[in-house]
Amino acid sequence: MQFATVQPVTARSDLPVITDEEAAALARTTVNLFRAWELTDAEARTLLGDMAQRTWARWKTGNIGRIDRDLRARMAILMGIHKALRYLFTDPARGYAWIRRPNAAFAGRSALDVMLRGEITDLIDLRAYLDAERGAW
């Protein structure tokens, strides 16, 4: 039996990096988006990767601390979802309400139900669905 030779993969330096300032702005915008979506604190914390209750309470008062890479990615995906909804619905209120409506594409569940499964891949899948719906392929 022979093992395959594996070539090391180097990290790509050309990918965009979310700076600390951008992450703080994303956090403030995420708080506002969650207000528009009328999320409960528990729902908001789940979408943010099971954020601690105390941390979420601080965020709501504008006290944003250190934001790790996973959380930055989650917030960026959530902003992509919001942007896609704004493209699909000219009336922002319709887009905000859409996330709670049952959807045949999600076996009768809402987009929020899909996102509340809690995995970052659930957010990615919803973003991909919305991009396909708006014809961004």
Label each PLM-derived region with a short phrase.
Residues M1-W137:
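Non-transmembrane "mature" sequence context
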